[in-house]
């Protein structure tokens, strides 16, 4: 709904819609489900708008303007490419992953509110140590939200400890603001 309202605000388009959304990504899992839904809605609205009004075209850069206002990681969801995210997920750089990997997602069925995780985050105490960094294809994998997420859901630490012991794992960590963890093989 926020995507639709923001799109209308930008374009002045008052066309009526009924939007049905089937959710398959768990809420509060740190997998960007809500952000992906918002991005998909923006992409659809742009397509419909541009088909209806051939004279006034909404550009991709217009979508990025809206996406940045709606949420820091929504712009990344407008892409369908390998990306390196930093900052709050709002600094996006295309990144080629040279190897083929297999991914394991472990979701402990804990709904972690992004706001609660950020409220438990302290910029002052945030220090990256080498033991917290994981290298993959010359990329450093590091998630600043891991410590506050573990504070709220200690099970995350158990999952990561288990993942670390799996043979042939090349990287592991927590996705987004948690609670889903991943292993890369």
Where are these regions (language model features)?
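Active-site catalytic microenvironments for nucleophilic, acid-base chemistry
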Residues: 6, 10, 44-52, 69
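Short, active-site-adjacent cap segments at secondary-structure transitions
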Residues: 26-27, 112, 179-182
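Short pre-catalytic strand/loop immediately N-terminal to key active-site residues, enriched for Gly-Thr
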Residues: 17-29, 170-172
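N-terminal beta-alpha supersecondary unit
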Residues: 1-17, 26, 119
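Glycine-rich beta-strand-to-loop/alpha-helix junction loops that act as flexible
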Residues: 33-34, 174-179
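Conserved hydrophobic residues forming the short capping helix/wall of the S-adenosyl-L-methionine
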Residues: 4-8, 46, 160-163, 167
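DPxDG-like acidic metal-binding loop motif
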Residues: 29-60, 76
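ATP-dependent small-molecule kinase catalytic core of the GHMP/sugar-kinase superfamily
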Residues: 51-171, 184
